Amino acid sequence: MTTAVLPRVGIGVDVHPFAAGRPCWVACLEWPGETGLAGHSDGDVAAHATCDALLTASCLGDLGKVFGTDRPEYAGASGAVLLAETARLLAVGGWVIGNVSVQVIGNRPRMAARREQAQAAMSAALGASVSLSATTTDGLGLTGRGEGLAAIATALVVRA
């Protein structure tokens, strides 16, 4: 009897409030002129949701377990660093990343003009295909009120 290798899917969510005086990093890009996001690392919600989706898909934990506030070496770390480390952990665990789809939710920054650049930056950091979309909540909730930014990611992984 043969056993089929089935893909696994993970979902990740990340939310950060805006924080004046910090640079704004979203999808591994700096967004000059935009208010930054509070967080232990750079607050990159797109990168963080992506890491969380990959870690849960591969049963390697979640964002808080792997990069939590109890890990001083990740204080101020960029989303690109977290993506690269997540990819390394998956490879060591015997997983291959199929792809990731991430959606940024909020009024600002406006992602459309830099979508391809953001996808390329995230894909390069991760070493796998990342697609990016963005939406607003039409004035509803914390993102609609302009209090912060959120992201939801879905990741597909398979055994190496």
UniProtKB/Swiss-Prot annotation:
Disulfide bridge map: none
Keywords of this entry: Isoprene biosynthesis, Lyase, Metal-binding
Residue numbers binding a divalent metal cation: D14, H16, H48
GO biological process, one term: isopentenyl diphosphate biosynthetic process, methylerythritol 4-phosphate pathway
The keyword Lyase is assigned to this record: yes
Pathway: Isoprenoid biosynthesis; isopentenyl diphosphate biosynthesis via DXP pathway; isopentenyl diphosphate from 1-deoxy-D-xylulose 5-phosphate: step 4/6
Reactions this protein catalyses: 4-CDP-2-C-methyl-D-erythritol 2-phosphate = 2-C-methyl-D-erythritol 2,4-cyclic diphosphate + CMP
Binding residue positions for 4-CDP-2-C-methyl-D-erythritol 2-phosphate: D14, V15, H16, H40, S41, D62, L63, G64, T135, T136, T137, D138, R145
Subunit structure of this chain's protein: Homotrimer.
Protein's UniProt name: 2-C-methyl-D-erythritol 2,4-cyclodiphosphate synthase
